[in-house]
C-alpha cells in the first residue's frame, strides 16, 4: 500500500523521468496576482507562461501544489469536501500535447499505480474525436469512453476571452454494487459509483469576446490530480479522514476531546471539521494570511471560528487550536518545511485569534439561542444576523449554518442591507470626500468628461486651458473673487489624491485672475478637480491658464512617499516576508503605513527598521520609474496590492540598482534616496487584530521631531534633578512611589466603605416580601462598590441590593440578586437597564449581578428612588 508521501514522490519522479522539471509548490497567496483570492490549482503559478508573457526554463514541468477553495466550506465535515488540498500536475508549455499527455497518464495509473484497467472509465468533450482515438490507442474500449458537454469537459477561458480547450478525465469505477445499481450507469451519473481521478486539460484555443475560437500556435497541457482523492483510492479507505494524511490530525482531535471517531455521525462530523479547518488555517497563516474582515483574511477567520464552534460541540471549552495546529505541523512539515520555519508565528496567531473569538462566543451563542426561540415565520432577521456578526464576531455563514440545523433560514438580503448601512457610515466618517463643489449631480453634468492629462512627473508648471468650472450650483462659465469652485484643466501638473498620496496644492493663473488650489481630486472618469478659491480677478471657461504646483510641498510629499516604499522593504526584512501592506497615507508632514503583523514591534525591531531605511538614504540610491505591461511587471516580481485594479500598462517605481524596492505606483517620488535626508519613526501602534500602524517623518520634520524629543528630555531631566541618562530610572522610582500611595488610599477607602456598609445593613427593608437595600454611596469607585455589594449580599442572605455612586463625574449603578429570588423571577440585569435609562445611559447583565451607567449624574437619586417600582 502506498503512503501519501510515497504517492507524491512517485508521481513527481515519474514525470521527471519523462523530462519534466520538478517545481516546488507556490504559496497559497498567488504571487503578485491581485485577481485571485487564493491559489486554486496547480497551473496558477504558471499563468505567465500560458499567457505568453514569460518563458519557462523547461517547457515540461511537474508539481504538487497546495491549493485552497472556498466554495464548499459549509460542506466540510462530510466524507469528501475539503478547503485545502494538494494537486498533482504535469504541465507542457507549447511542447507536448494530447498524445503524450494521454499516453503518460494511462501508463502512470495502470503501470505505476497498478490500478486495473477494467476499473477505469474516460470522459471527453463532445466533439473531441482526436482524444477518443488516442484513448483507444491505449486500449480503452469505446464503451468506457463517454462524451460530455462543456459543463463537465471544457475548460476556460478565465473571463470573457483567452486561452481555453477541451479536457478529458479518468474515472475509477467502484462497481455496480455501489451507487444507483443501474446497468447503464456511467461517469455522467452522480450516484457515487464513479470517482474522478485525473483531469487532463488540452489548452488549444484562444477565444475572443464574441465566442469565436482560433487554434493557438503552440497548444499546451495542464493536468490536475487530487492527492487526497488518490490516497483514498490507493489505501482502500472510505474517506480522506481515514487515510494517513488526516489520521494523525483526527487522532489529536479525539485525544483533546475525549471522543472516539466512528461512533456516531454528529461526533464524526465535528471531528472532521476541527481537523480539516485546523490544517487549512495552519497553512494559510504560514503563507502569510492574517485574520481580517474581508478577502482571504475573512476566509481564515471564518474557518478558525467554525472550528472553534464545532470544538465546543465536542466539549472543548478551553483553547485547543494551537494543539491541533501542532499536530498539522508535525504531520506536514516534512513536505512543507515553511510550516516548521514559521511555527512560532503560526501558533501565536492562532492563539490570539482563538482567544479573541472565545471572549464573545458564549454570549453570542446565548443570544443566538434566544433569537431562535423568538423567531417566527422560520426566518432569522438580517438585523439579528448582523448583530451576531458585528458584536459577537459570528460570520453570517456560520449563523446560517446553525440556523439551518434548527430548521430556520436567515434573511441574507436584510443582512447585506445592514452591512451597507455600516459601510455608508464608515465612508461618511472618512476624511476624503467631495465637497459641495463636486457633488454627484455636478459631476454628472460636467461639460468636459475627457481624462485630464497629467504632466506632473516631469513638470511643476504647465500652460493649460480651463475646460470646465464646477460650483455648488453646478457648472458655470466664470467665477470671481471669493468664489469657491473646482476647475477642470485639459493638462495639469497637479497630482490628484490617489493611492494614499494627498493631492497637490498651488495656483492656476489666467490673464484675468488667480485661483488658489487647496486640493486636487481624482474622479472615477479620470478627470482631475482642482478645488479652491478665487484670490483675485475672474477666471473663465476656455481661457488659457498657467498651472503651478506648490513645489516645496510636493518635495516633502515625495520624500515621504519614497520612504514609505523603502519602509515596506525594511519591515519584510526585519519582521518576515509575511508582512503585507494594508494601507498608507502620504502627506507633506508625515507618512502612515498600515501592515499585517501579529504583535507590537520591539524597540530593537523598530531600531533595525530605522537603520535599514536610513542606510538606503545615505547610499543615495537612484529612484526611477518605467512603464511596462502589467503581466511583465508581475513576472519580474514587482509588488502589487491585492484588490487593486490595474490597467494593461502599469508604472513601476524602483529604488536602487539592483532594486531594493519595486512596486506598482503612480505617485510622485524623489529622484535619489539621499533627498529624503532622514527617516524617524514617531509611533507604532495597533489598529486592529493582526494589524499594526507606523507613523514616521522625514527630512525637516524628522529633524524637528528629534529636536522636540531632546527638548522634552532636557525639561524632564531638570524636573527630576537628574541627567538624561538617569531620568528613566528616577521616573520609574517615582512611579513606584505613586503606586504605593495609591494602594494605601484604596485600602483606606475599603476600610471606610466597610464601615459604611455595616451601617447600610440597618437600612434594609422588607418590601413586598423581599429584603430590599437601596442606597447612594459617596467617594467610592466601581471596584469598591462591587466589594461593598458582595459584603451586603453575604450578610443579607436573601435580598435585592441596589447601590449607586458618582464616579468620574458620571452616575454608576450596581445590582445584586440572591439565588432564591432569581428563582422567583427577579433579574439584576433588567433592574440596572431601567436605572441606566433614567440617567441617560445603558447597562445590563446577568440575573445575579449587573452594572451600568449614565450620562446625567443629577438623575442618580431619581433613579434610585424608582427601584421600588421595579420590584
Swiss-Prot record:
Signal sequence segment: none
Chain residues that bind Zn(2+): 561, 565, 665, 669
Database matches in InterPro entries: aa-tRNA-synth_II/BPL/LPL, Ala-tRNA-lgiase_IIc, Ala-tRNA-ligase_IIc_anticod-bd, Ala-tRNA-synth_IIc_core, Ala-tRNA-synth_IIc_N, Ala-tRNA_ligase, Ala_tRNA_ligase_euk/bac, DHHA1_dom
Catalytic activity: tRNA(Ala) + L-alanine + ATP = L-alanyl-tRNA(Ala) + AMP + diphosphate
GO cellular component, one term: cytosol
Listed GO MF terms: alanine-tRNA ligase activity; aminoacyl-tRNA deacylase activity; ATP binding; tRNA binding; zinc ion binding
UniProt KW Aminoacyl-tRNA synthetase keyword: yes
Details of cofactor binding: Binds 1 zinc ion per subunit.
Subcellular location field: Cytoplasm
The protein's role, per its UniProt record: Catalyzes the attachment of alanine to tRNA(Ala) in a two-step reaction: alanine is first activated by ATP to form Ala-AMP and then transferred to the acceptor end of tRNA(Ala). Also edits incorrectly charged Ser-tRNA(Ala) and Gly-tRNA(Ala) via its editing domain.
NCBIfam families: alaS
Name of this chain's protein: Alanine--tRNA ligase
Lineage: Bacteria, Bacillati, Chloroflexota, Dehalococcoidia, Dehalococcoidales
Gene that specifies this protein: alaS
